[in-house]
């Protein structure tokens, strides 16, 4: 049967719409685990919202003065609440990293959405676990327990701060309909600046309780090298 040009056009257009709809449905179906983790993150946020509000002033203070990190550790309740919020922040952090391709090496390009999501969660979960383990193994000598807690746990404070910033950027991007590439670049810059400020505060705490050389070796072994390997794996491979 011979179709007119108009009929052929509308027929092709209809098929294209169907294909796009099926593609969207399949993509959403394949990303099912993302929505599961998102629901878990929202529930945890609602449970911890009062705790988050209570610790925010202390978190802001740690960015202004390094001694505030030690003051935070002096309060067992605040430090415990901060640690719990840091653990709960891992899920939303990984979801943002996955959604905006903040960690997207070339070898992950051909993988499915669910596989990439699990890899991102696995890699950052492993990174945080190894880093925490090494910090407890390679404890600098001649350092008080109070100062040591400040050195180790200042990372938790800045991790929460970084996650909050990334969530705010993601929310603002959704409101103002920003391009994904611009959002990704903004998040990378915020991550870099937060990391630099974190290292400065950690160096200041180390300098207050041990020699500069000891503190430098400590940072190289447990901060600079692991983070460098993570960044290199994302850029080169």
Predicted regions and their residues:
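Long, highly hydrophobic alpha-helical transmembrane signal-anchor segments
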Residues: 1-37, 91-111
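Terminal transmembrane helical module of multi-pass membrane proteins
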Residues: 165-237
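Alpha-helical transmembrane segments with an aromatic anchor "belt"
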Residues: 102-175
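Hydrophobic alpha-helical transmembrane segments of multi-pass integral membrane proteins
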Residues: 83-100, 125-130, 160-168, 195, ...
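Perimembrane loop-to-helix junctions flanking transmembrane segments
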Residues: 60-73, 108-112
């Amino acid at each position: 049967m011979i179709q007119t040009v108009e009929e052929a056009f509308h027929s092709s257009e209809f098929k294209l719409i169907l294909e796009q709809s099926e593609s969207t449905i399949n993509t959403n179906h394949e990303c099912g685990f993302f929505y599961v983790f998102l629901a878990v993150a929202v529930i945890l946020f609602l449970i911890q919202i009062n705790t988050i509000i209570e610790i925010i002033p202390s978190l802001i203070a740690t960015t202004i003065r390094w001694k505030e990190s030690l003051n935070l550790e002096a309060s067992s309740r605040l430090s415990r609440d901060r640690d719990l919020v840091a653990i709960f922040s891992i899920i939303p952090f990984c979801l943002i990293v996955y959604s905006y391709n903040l960690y997207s090496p070339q070898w992950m390009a051909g993988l499915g959405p669910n596989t990439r999501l699990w890899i991102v969660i696995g890699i950052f979960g492993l990174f945080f676990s190894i880093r925490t383990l090494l910090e407890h193994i390679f404890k600098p000598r001649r350092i008080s327990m109070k100062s040591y807690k400040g050195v180790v746990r200042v990372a938790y404070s800045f991790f929460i701060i970084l996650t909050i910033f990334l969530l705010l950027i993601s929310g603002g991007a959704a409101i103002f309909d920003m391009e994904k590439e611009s959002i990704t670049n903004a998040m990378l810059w915020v991550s870099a600046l937060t990391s630099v400020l974190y290292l400065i505060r950690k160096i200041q705490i180390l300098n207050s309780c041990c020699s500069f050389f000891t503190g430098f070796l400590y940072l190289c072994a447990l901060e600079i090298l692991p983070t460098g390997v993570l960044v290199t794996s994302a850029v080169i491979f």
